[in-house]
C-alpha cells in the first residue's frame, strides 16, 4: 500500500513539473523574427491574389516591426490601397492622411492625396444610391462635398499626375450629385414657400458648381424666389442670363466611362 501511495506521489509530481519545465524552456527560446522583405513579398502575393485582408496583416506587420525599415514607407502607401480594396474606406482615408502628414516629399505623395479623395467618394455611396429616391432636404451630404474638395485639391496640387484623369472622372459624378441634391432641397423649400432657404440652395449650385448640368434648373429656381420675394430687378437680371445663354448652359465635362461606385483603384508606384 505504501508503494502504491509513493508511486502516485511521484507520478503526480512528474505530471505537474515536466510541463512546467517544458514551458519554461520554450519561453526562454529566442523568437525568430521574419525578415522585413518576407513580410513585404507575402503582402504582394496576397494582393495579387485579391486576398486584401491578409495583405493588410502583412503590411501592418511591417509598420509595427520595421517602422524605419527599407519597405516602411512603401508599405504605408500600399496600406492605403489594400484598405480601400478591402472595403475599409475609413481606414484607407486615415492611412492616406497619415502618409501625407509623415511623408510630404515622398514620390507617392500624389497617390495619397488622390486616394484620400477616392475613399471619401465611396464611403458615402449608400447615401448616393438613395439620392434620387427620397426627399433629401434634410439629408447630410458632407461626405460628397468632402470628396469633391479633396479631389479638387489633388488636381490643383498635381495637375500632371498619372492619377489626374481618374480624379477628373469622379469629379464629374460628384459635381452632378451635389448639384442635384442641393436643388432637390431647393424645390422642397420652394413648395413650402421657404424662399430664402430655397434661394440659398440654388445659389450654392451657381457659385460652387459652375457649368454643371443643373445650372439652368438652379437659375429658374432663383428667378422664382426673387419674384416671390419681390426682388423684381434681380429677377429681371436672372431672366436676362437665362435668355442670353439659353441652351448653351450645359455640363462642360466629358462623359466618363467609369461606373459610379466602381470598387477599383490603381496601386501606388513601387519606389
Where are these regions (language model features)?
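Bacterial N-terminal signal peptides that target proteins for export
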Residues: 2-15
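Acidic, polar-rich low-complexity tracts and alpha-helical solenoid repeat scaffolds
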Residues: 4-7, 25-271
Amino acid at each position: 500500500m505504501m508503494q502504491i501511495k509513493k508511486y502516485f506521489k511521484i507520478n503526480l509530481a512528474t505530471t505537474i513539473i515536466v510541463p512546467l519545465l517544458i514551458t519554461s524552456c520554450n519561453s526562454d527560446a529566442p523568437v525568430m523574427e521574419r525578415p522585413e522583405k518576407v513580410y513585404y513579398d507575402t503582402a504582394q502575393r496576397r494582393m495579387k491574389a485579391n486576398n486584401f485582408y491578409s495583405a493588410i496583416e502583412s503590411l501592418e506587420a511591417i509598420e509595427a516591426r520595421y517602422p524605419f525599415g527599407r519597405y516602411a514607407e512603401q508599405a504605408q502607401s500600399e496600406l492605403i490601397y489594400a484598405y480601400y480594396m478591402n472595403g475599409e474606406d475609413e481606414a484607407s482615408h486615415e492611412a492616406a492622411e497619415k502618409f501625407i502628414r509623415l511623408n510630404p516629399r515622398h514620390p507617392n505623395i500624389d497617390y495619397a492625396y488622390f486616394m484620400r479623395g477616392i475613399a471619401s467618394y465611396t464611403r458615402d455611396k449608400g447615401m448616393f444610391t438613395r439620392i434620387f429616391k427620397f426627399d433629401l432636404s434634410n439629408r447630410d451630404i458632407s461626405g460628397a462635398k468632402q470628396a469633391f474638395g479633396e479631389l479638387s485639391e489633388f488636381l490643383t496640387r498635381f495637375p500632371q499626375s498619372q492619377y489626374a484623369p481618374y480624379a477628373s472622372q469622379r469629379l464629374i459624378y460628384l459635381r452632378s450629385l451635389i448639384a442635384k441634391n442641393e436643388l432637390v432641397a431647393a424645390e422642397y423649400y420652394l413648395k413650402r414657400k421657404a424662399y430664402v432657404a430655397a434661394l440659398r440652395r440654388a445659389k450654392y449650385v451657381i457659385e460652387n458648381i459652375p457649368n454643371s448640368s443643373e445650372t439652368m434648373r438652379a437659375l429658374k429656381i432663383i428667378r422664382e424666389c426673387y419674384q416671390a420675394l419681390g426682388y423684381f430687378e434681380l429677377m429681371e437680371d436672372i431672366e436676362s442670363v437665362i435668355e442670353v445663354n439659353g441652351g448653351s448652359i450645359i455640363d462642360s465635362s466629358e462623359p466618363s466611362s467609369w461606373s459610379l461606385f466602381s470598387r477599383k483603384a490603381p496601386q501606388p508606384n513601387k519606389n
